[in-house]
Amino acid sequence: MTESVLDYMSRLGRDARAASRLLARAATAQKNRALLAAADALDAARAELSHANEQDLAAGRANGLEPAMLDRLALTPARIDDMIEGLRQVATLPDPIGEIRDMRYVPSGIQIGKMRVPLGVVGIIYESRPNVTIDAASLCLKSGNATILRGGSEAIHSNQAIARCIQQGLAEAGLPAAAVQVVETTDRAAVGALISMPEYVDVIVPRGGKGLIERISREAKVPVIKHLDGICHVYIDVAADLDKAIRVADNAKTQRYAPCNTMETLLVHAGIAERVLPPLATIYREKGVELRGDAATRALLGADVLEATEEDWRTEYNAPILSIRIVDGLDAAIEHINTYGSQHTDAIITENFSDARRFLAEVDSASVMVNASTRFADGFEYGLGAEIGISTDKLHARGPVGLEGLTSEKYVVFGDGHVRT
């Protein structure tokens, strides 16, 4: 790690810490002005954004980036529209900062409650997608947090162009420029520095591949909000409605293959397998989904179903591949999910209320669903407006992390000259 990178990151950290104190007391209207002005700046800078993005795409093609990575990197006109709309949408969301709840009198006569406050400085580390710059900056700004954004080197020109628009919005609203800072060096040492500055950074949110997140979780000296895998399950109970089961299991797998809330393993009660699996298998085959199953599944569906290995149950495919297991009942389904799952999102399809309640209580995941597709595990679908990511951790934020997940609470106490006796 070079001294210059350390000095540079320390300067960003100091400036962010100072800006966070100003942001914490900024009025809602002022934060909204910054968001709306940034949206207007993006709209006016479409040509500049496209030019910067083409620089990144050209470099990516020259460096042999895979087509999927190039697709994530591209800022199409539609994606620029989405970024602009995203800023304007966040401006309409309720501001959680300063909200006081649970006010109550205690026997001593003092009144106690909790006030929602920003976390302080949020470090975001992400890969490829320039639109994350807008998502992260807008949510952090609205929740009163300063943010330091370290995007992937492959998107450096795009991120810098987006940052200039955000800076314009901050300036027009009279907010400090250091409220949103983009790391402008591609030196990987910047990541190590960012995750090792607890004096300046309060939390890190990594968004990227498993290797990146594992490294940050292992090395960070700052709390991390993260999820490693999206190994999501749908369990079709013996008391499932057949039409609901087929509709949900189809959507959970085939609506999109890459997102982290896509089903990777289908569990089916043995008592309903013969009725539900053949029609589902037909749908999957027509859509080009490769099926892998246990012995019972292969015996039922035919030789074109590949043998599922132990590794399959632990794999997030992000592809048209599905593992299927026939289980004896609810106990076996819950045991499988808690053994092989990633604590992300899991669903049961059933008309049995007690089975549904048991599933909700005993499956140890951030989102647990009844008769609904795992694809709903998303900040927008949950009514959060937007999300900065999904957390499978249990401390602080869990599930889709929106504005409230970027805040904390402090106790507020009112008295009238009260003293403790």
From Swiss-Prot:
GO MF term set: glutamate-5-semialdehyde dehydrogenase activity; NADP binding
PROSITE patterns in the record: PROA (PS01223)
Kindly tell me the pathway this chain contributes to.
Answer: Amino-acid biosynthesis; L-proline biosynthesis; L-glutamate 5-semialdehyde from L-glutamate: step 2/2
EC number in record: 1.2.1.41
Of the GO CC terms on this record, one is: cytoplasm
Catalysed conversion reaction: L-glutamate 5-semialdehyde + phosphate + NADP(+) = L-glutamyl 5-phosphate + NADPH + H(+)
Q: Which family does it belong to?
A: Belongs to the gamma-glutamyl phosphate reductase family.
* Entry protein name: Gamma-glutamyl phosphate reductase
Q: Which gene encodes it?
A: proA
